[in-house]
Amino acid sequence: MKVLIIQDQMLTKGGSEKVFTYIAVCFPYAELFTLSYNKDTSLAFSRSDDLNTSPIFNMLIRKHSAFKFFFPLLTYYFQFKNFKHYDLIITSSATVAKYIRKFDGKHICYCYVPTRAIWEVDNYFPKKTFIKKVFNIFLPWLKSRDLKTTN
């Protein structure tokens, strides 16, 4: 059985990152994937050498603040990435990994809802910045899409 475990990003020492590391230990032969990993700011874990990243996003997103900037675009990354050669995909998703495209195998999502970036915008973007203004333009569409994906 070909198994893939996905985490949105590994840039902080948060709860979803901890869950991801525990799942990775439970499935020692699974492939591991995240959009971006920063070993200096994220959790150290036994399988960090096995962690695959998106080369482009790993280069662009080295801090959590950059992840916020790219959030609307990142939702599409998982929708268009081809996962058809996996039998099982387990996602630990607070934001974007839950958007994976349907495939023939099984998808188990440990989904942290609501997605704070969408439903608690003032906490996620506390200042009136350009990024927040642009994000607010996409907000109704992102909320609709988030509801559809999580249901």
Model-derived segments and spans:
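Short catalytic/ligand-binding loop motif for oxyanion handling, primarily in non-cytosolic enzymes
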Residues: T12-K13, D40-S42, A97-R101, R116-W119
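Short, conserved loop/helix-junction motifs that constitute active-site signature segments
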Residues: A24-F27, F83-K84, Y99-D104, T150
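Nucleotide-activated donor-dependent transferases that construct or modify glycoconjugates
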Residues: M1-K13, L35-S36
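Short amphipathic alpha-helix
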Residues: S16-C26
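Hydrophobic anchor at the start of a short beta-strand
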Residues: V3, Y29-A30, H107
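Active-site donor-binding segments of glycosyltransferases and PAPS-dependent sulfotransferases
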Residues: Y29-K98
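Membrane-proximal helix-turn-helix segments that form the acceptor-binding/catalytic region
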Residues: K127, K132-N151
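Active-site proximal beta-strand in glycosyltransferases
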Residues: L88-T91, R101-T129
